[in-house]
Amino acid sequence: MTKGILGRKVGMTQVFTDKGELIPVTVIEALPNVVLQVKTPETDGYSALQLGVFDKRKIAANKPEQGHAKKASAAPKRYVREIRDAQGDYKQGDKVKVDVFAAGEYVDVQGITKGHGFQGSIKRLGQSRGPMAHGSRYHRRPGSMGSIINKVFKGKLLPGQMGGDLRTAQKLLVAGVDPANNLILIKGNVPGANKSFVTIKSTVKPFKASKIKLGGTVGQEVKAEAKDTASTEKKQAETKNDSASAE
C-alpha cells in the first residue's frame, strides 16, 4: 500500500540533527489535501485516491471542474493527482494531512524540472567539445551526423529544449515533519523550481527506516529563515524607494 500527499516546493535550507550533524533539506508546504474521488477496481478498474490541493479561483475553473469538486464539498483545485493503491480508509471529502509521513521514512518525489530553454548538445547532453585550436572549424557543434544516409534517425542526440520534464527523485529521506505549519522536510534536493508543485509518495525501493531526529522544533528554523528573508526584501524595497524619492 502507498501513502502520498501533494505539496509545493518552498526552497532549501539547512538543519541540525540532535547529534549536531548539519544536513541540507528541501522544505515542502503540504496543505491538507482534499480527497476529490475514491477509485475502486469495481467502478474504475483500479484502486486510487484522487487528491487536490491549493484552491483555484472559480472564474478560472470550468464547469466540469467545479462540479467534480462540489461532490467532495470543496473548491476547485489547482493541483490534482492520483495516488495508486493508497493506504488508509478514506472517503470522498476527507483530508490527507502532512502527518501521514514521519521522520525516518523514505519517499519518492515527483515534479517538473527547471526549464533551461534551447541548449546545445554539450550542456544538454554532456557531449565532448571539438578541438579548440585555431585550425579547427568546430568547437561546440554537434559534429558529424553519420555518412551517406540522408535522414536523421529518431532519438539522435542533438541540441534542443532542455528541462521542463517530469522527473522522479527516488528514496529520499524524510528529515522532519511539522504538522502545525503543514511542512515536510526532505533531505537533499527535489525536482523543480521554487513554488512548483510536487507529488510525494512512499518509495518503491526497499529501505530500512532511519532513526533521524532534528534538534529543536522543525518549524522554528524554517520560520526564522523565512522571516530573515522577508526583512531583507523589505529593507531593499525601502532603500529603493528612498533612492527614487531623492532623484
Curated annotation (Swiss-Prot):
Q: Where is the composition biased (Basic and acidic residues)?
A: 222-241
Positions of the UniProt region annotated as Disordered? 124-145, 218-247
Molecular function (GO) terms for this protein are:
rRNA binding; structural constituent of ribosome
> Among its keywords, does the record have Magnesium?
no
Instruction: Spell out the Gene3D superfamilies in the cross-references.
Output: 3.30.160.810, Translation factors
Q: Which UniProt keywords apply?
A: Ribonucleoprotein, Ribosomal protein, RNA-binding, rRNA-binding
Instruction: Kindly state the subunit structure of this protein.
Output: Part of the 50S ribosomal subunit. Forms a cluster with proteins L14 and L19.
Q: What NCBIfam families does the annotation carry? A: L3_bact (TIGR03625)
Query: In its UniProt entry, what is this protein called?
Result: Large ribosomal subunit protein uL3
Q: Which organism is it from?
A: Oenococcus oeni (strain ATCC BAA-331 / PSU-1)
